């Protein structure tokens, strides 16, 4: 990167390729294109300086350019070291938006890039965060706490945390007061995924959330579509691209049966696999059983199953003793946000053979091997290209509306976690119906009055579960 280039990408020469794919994606993302049409003239995000930490894909490129069309300035990094699509990053960088994302970047580079998305060329600060997993938010909040004298940058729990702490210390030494200045300028954060939302709720419970947050993940048009239908298509895509293994007839174990687990089980079942599910929640376990899946304990199937997928958002779901007991050439992968669902760190002292990018063969002393996808990180983005554009349009439309809401009406919100109102959820769904040729039935005024709603919606009470 030359001195006048405010970006880091793998190859800026891929920009034309990326631009062609962005043009195709735009035709599959009616929600985002409708946001441009509705808000492009008024530019409600004029003055917004958005720091974005979210998978740098073709679909994200359409999101970024929508934010820019609505008046925002944007700086962007990926939220995963393997999820960047280099041609997408190149196209966005070539358009003039600072982006710092390379597929296969190191953890050191990852946290350096996270730091860079808060460094504006004129020395100014961000006033909004668009996050996926919470890393950008946590980077600023941990740094500000350290500046305040809290002794929190000790005893890292993982290699990544050690690298994160080192990056924070580096910034603390270089620019005292920087983190506090950044934190105090933030009007709000919009969070994309379950893991990041959990972090925000934990901060709220402890009284440590310093600005309002919108939980985009729990918008119905995100969690019930992206998490379920997106995984339904992208999980098997990632396994196939990574391994070329036929799934029909194989035994696949899905750990977790939340929305992501439901989509993952359906994905594998649709490919002909015989799916078993592990669960800690009796409600989700009962759902899995009544959906026709055998609900098991991992220990009972670990030596007989062929494919293992974690979807829980928790840590140490598949541990070293489980992998040691697996049959030769079992496939192990994760579609939850972080890499600690599988105890990858416990595998590091074993023999690794890299087959191709994001596919490793790991051999145990007794001779059995496992195929590990994307080093335990999101395999649908590491081994493939993630969810299809159409379903991401729904998720990202929620992000755009949430950014507008917090930026323009932030004074109406306390330092708590909110969800978008149901009428906006329904609006996002409505924007995607025509693309599928779907036609809504309309309530008469009499029918609407009978069930206690307005004829144009919202059609469900806030407590309704879809």
Swiss-Prot record:
Binding site for substrate: 57, 132, 192, 222, 226
Pathway participation: Amino-acid biosynthesis; L-homocysteine biosynthesis; L-homocysteine from S-adenosyl-L-homocysteine: step 1/1
Protein name (Swiss-Prot/TrEMBL): Adenosylhomocysteinase
MF GO annotations: adenosylhomocysteinase activity
Gene Ontology biological process: L-homocysteine biosynthetic process; one-carbon metabolic process; S-adenosylmethionine cycle
Cofactor note: Binds 1 NAD(+) per subunit.
Catalytic activity: S-adenosyl-L-homocysteine + H2O = L-homocysteine + adenosine
SUPFAM superfamilies per UniProt: Formate/glycerate dehydrogenase catalytic domain-like, NAD(P)-binding Rossmann-fold domains
Domain of life from the UniProt record: Bacteria
Location in or out of the cell: Cytoplasm
Keyword terms, alphabetized: Cytoplasm, Hydrolase, NAD, One-carbon metabolism
Xref: NCBIfam families: ahcY, PRK05476.2-3
Gene3D superfamilies documented for this protein: Adenosylhomocysteinase-like, NAD(P)-binding Rossmann-like Domain
Cofactor(s) recorded in Swiss-Prot or TrEMBL: NAD(+)
GO CC list: cytosol
EC annotation from Swiss-Prot or TrEMBL: 3.13.2.1
InterPro entries noted in UniProt: Adenosylhomocyst_ase-like_sf (IPR042172), Adenosylhomocysteinase-like (IPR000043), Ado_hCys_hydrolase_NAD-bd (IPR015878), NAD(P)-bd_dom_sf (IPR036291), S-Ado-L-homoCys_hydrolase_CS (IPR020082)
Binding, NAD(+): 193-195, 227, 256-261, 279, 314, 335-337, 380
HAMAP family the UniProt entry points to: AdoHcyase
Family (UniProt): Belongs to the adenosylhomocysteinase family.
EC class of the enzyme, as a word: hydrolase
Role this protein plays: May play a key role in the regulation of the intracellular concentration of adenosylhomocysteine.
